[in-house]
Amino acid sequence: MQSTSNHLWLLSDILGQGATANVFRGRHKKTGDLYAVKVFNNISFLRPVDVQMREFEVLKKLNHKNIVKLFAIEEETTTRHKVLIMEFCPCGSLYTVLEEPSNAYGLPESEFLIVLRDVVGGMNHLRENGIVHRDIKPGNIMRVIGEDGQSVYKLTDFGAARELEDDEQFVSLYGTEEYLHPDMYERAVLRKDHQKKYGATVDLWSVGVTFYHAATGSLPFRPFEGPRRNKEVMYKIITGKPSGAISGVQKAENGPIDWSGDMPLSCSLSQGLQALLTPVLANILEADQEKCWGFDQFFAETSDVLHRMVIHVFSLQHMTAHKIYIHSYNTAAVFHELVYKQTKIVSSNQELIYEGRRLVLELGRLAQHFPKTTEENPIFVTSREQLNTVGLRYEKISLPKIHPRYDLDGDASMAKAVTGVVCYACRTASTLLLYQELMRKGVRWLVELVKDDYNETVHKKTEVVITLDFCIRNIEKTVKVYEKLMKVNLEAAELGEISDIHTKLLRLSSSQGTIESSLQDISSRLSPGGLLADTWAHQEGTHPRDRNVEKLQVLLNCITEIYYQFKKDKAERRLAYNEEQIHKFDKQKLYYHATKAMSHFSEECVRKYEAFKDKSEEWMRKMLHLRKQLLSLTNQCFDIEEEVSKYQDYTNELQETLPQKMLAASGGVKHAMAPIYPSSNTLVEMTLGMKKLKEEMEGVVKELAENNHILERFGSLTMDGGLRNVDCL
């Protein structure tokens, strides 16, 4: 045990070891509170005094939630050597987190965003104080759990740090080689002397490698044999990186370098976040310091990412989930454009559904006022055009080969890889199930909305039939009036045109039978048991009641337990006979559980999901055809309504001229009677006939007017027929 005046620690209670110091878990003598105690070794005292004091001076300047806090600088009781009393971080480092098999292929998106936020926050504080860290890596980013239960990451180990302004440079070498800037790598690792000096932006390269590692679980630049076994190829990769690339991997000995500007398929970050993150990585993983972003642009771009809100969207036809990263002050027009970037559905073709209702977003509506969404309750988007089903894009990862040879080191590495693969399969199975559940929900809602559209079309057709019937009756009565006018030798040039309209209206009336037949066909397809009922969605695929994810989790727990035991066995370096036999039995169990898990994943999860996806694509294609057919029928009804309305307007104009024609008819009779000198009987007959004609015409005019009034009232009752089941925001 060692101690200072206020703290004590056990030499066996070590938290970490470095080149110049060890860190122990210590306690305050009076309170018992835990602290991290950094004790410097003999090698550290070989450094110049100013270098030894540099870490103390740097830490004294820093005070930020994302920097490990320095509480005191004390002296060890016996040696009188300086020790640092620092904030204790019980959850280890980011490296510890990435070593967990569950993070073998990168952190979950929510955790990665916390890492991004906290590292950027800590880096910004360093820059505000003119400090360059020079050894940023996952092992120097500590983790604690905050009061809200979320992780908080803090930069630590400022042994390599020094004060440096943006326009200053340095020549001394520090850092960990996998995370080193290429210029520093050349001199520090390859031992090649050059006259280059290094600026503060060398930290940005290390940050870029760290972020890529956190996002994917792997280093971005990897020679075939590994970064530390083939340093020349490593240097070739980091200096030869094309502009825009964020990774370079050599997959075979002496093979070519595979460059990529995208995250690997196994990365769990969403497409929306990757689109924002990859340009940042591409511009800070830049060997040429002239081309590399400066701190100002780095902080501006990362701050832009961190200040966005997320809107969850599910593309029904693609069968894909999306996260739309958007500023709260952006409008719906921007949202539609961002949806297009991820789904390739143009804004004019995007139909939105939220909680079973159509969602219409006013183009000026701010994103902060959109409905609240989650992964399980997103906004659904469908297209008015045919789209191919995509489904979940994921890496098809196989189990590593399990060698029968007894090897503690090899077995621990193998067990870690196996556990990582099964973790990935378990996570993928959960996502596949979520996609199927969202499809079931979306299909059910889409069927209901199409039924609403069908009812609207039936409603419109009924309205058109009634209107058409009234109009035909009006025209027929108008024809009678004009025929009576013809009897008294009055000119009625409109009669021929009215007869043509009557013929056209009868033709339109006869077309209603075809529309009715098509509507009945659509109704039968949408009805329970019909071709487009949603019963298939409940029959195909996997369901929560199958508990496939839970079954995989049970196997994963067994595998993880064996992995942790193998880690302990590796630390022992050599096992007694009985422990060795148990180790061999566990290795057999590991193989059994892993193969069973992957077989279950393949047969029960993937195969059934693929069948569900194929059925979904077929159903969506048929549904789109039905919707287009229904839209065509609706348009036909509107076209007929428009044509009937035009004829009705013409009929109304004729009705307005009838009183004048009736007066003309009366005058025409008197004028015709004067020169003929008819007998008194003939005159009486003609007068009575005209009175009767006038009464009939007045009756027709009155009836026509009443019909028009009924039509107007009917129209006002149906004007809002198309606005049901719609949320307008």
Swiss-Prot record:
Coiled-coil residue windows: 407-657, 658-713
Active site per UniProt: 135 (proton acceptor)
Cross-link Glycyl lysine isopeptide (Lys-Gly) (interchain with G-Cter in ubiquitin) residue location(s): 30, 401, 670
Uppermost EC category: transferase
Domain notes: Comprises A N-terminal kinase domain, a ubiquitin-like domain and a C-terminal coiled-coil region mediating homodimerization.
Function, in words: Serine/threonine kinase that plays an essential role in regulating inflammatory responses to foreign agents. Following activation of toll-like receptors by viral or bacterial components, associates with TRAF3 and TANK and phosphorylates interferon regulatory factors (IRFs) IRF3 and IRF7 as well as DDX3X. This activity allows subsequent homodimerization and nuclear translocation of the IRFs leading to transcriptional activation of pro-inflammatory and antiviral genes including IFNA and IFNB.
Protein name (database record): Serine/threonine-protein kinase TBK1
Organism: Mus musculus (Mouse)
